[in-house]
């Protein structure tokens, strides 16, 4: 039995003339044109028979059009059984599920670091190539990805587009919102064996544990000072560069970190959000509460290596040690 073939009546463009497939003009083309790039491009265009009614984009397969249309409809039929997050494409769900399974099949040939998705590996490889084409006009800092520049720019604008639907708290990065939302869902699964503190991510608990171990893996190339956290090193390095990108709108004073700016702004607002549970006294900064609590606990963590005398504050120890130095100089 002879198989019937459907004759699709779609239009294509050739030499600014609209031709219909199967016409005499089209059949008269020279066979030698089959290898011509322009002709091949036209043939490929003819194959794109499935057109999106929203934006006009064309596809050669109906399945590809169906997936594309989800951009306009917002449909996300592929749902993760672990956390409920939904996706418009099945491949995105496959990559997402690796978060739960821990599978990281894409490995960097330079440093051996592994990733759950190929796109994550490609972005990471920009670190090794050193290519940083996206530069911040405010402070000159450069990034290998446009997304990195967009996130960084919020440092200057103060924009926090990611809000928690539970409590309204806003964040500048979606990853910070995700970690915060785990608190509401009760998913603080990472626990410190030393003090019992829990965190929403493995990286945060690893950073925290360095408080107990004393490990400071991040070293400044300029002065050799070491730090527990990478972000603290970054803030410190701005001192060497004399870079202070965080500026107070009230008085113009500038700071090396957003945290220091927020603490400073409370001078103008009078806000004292940190309260002592023992006596009810309030403070502008968490560090002030920690120092104040020692008046209740009688803790004296700063000990003199010369005579063993202990002090509540580091400034008291420094002042005490000067006496030993003076005694050595006069003796």
UniProtKB/Swiss-Prot annotation:
Keywords: DNA-binding, Metal-binding, Nucleus, Phosphoprotein, Repeat, Transcription, Transcription regulation, Zinc, Zinc-finger. Pfam families: zf-C2H2 (PF00096). The keyword Metal-binding applies. It comes from the Eukaryota. GO terms for biological process: regulation of transcription by RNA polymerase II. Residues 1-35 are annotated as: Disordered. Belongs to the krueppel C2H2-type zinc-finger protein family. One of its GO terms (cellular component) is nucleus. This is Zinc finger protein 660. The modification Phosphoserine is found at residue 23. A zinc finger (C2H2-type) spans 50-72, 78-100, 106-128, 134-156, 162-184, 190-212, 218-240, 246-268, 274-296, 302-324. PANTHER family: ZINC FINGER AND SCAN DOMAIN-CONTAINING, ZINC FINGER PROTEIN ZFP2. One of its GO terms (molecular function) is zinc ion binding. The keyword rRNA-binding does not apply. The lineage of its organism: Eukaryota, Metazoa, Chordata, Craniata, Vertebrata. May be involved in transcriptional regulation. It comes from Homo sapiens. Residues 1-12 have a biased composition (Basic residues). Coiled coil: none annotated. It is found in: Nucleus.
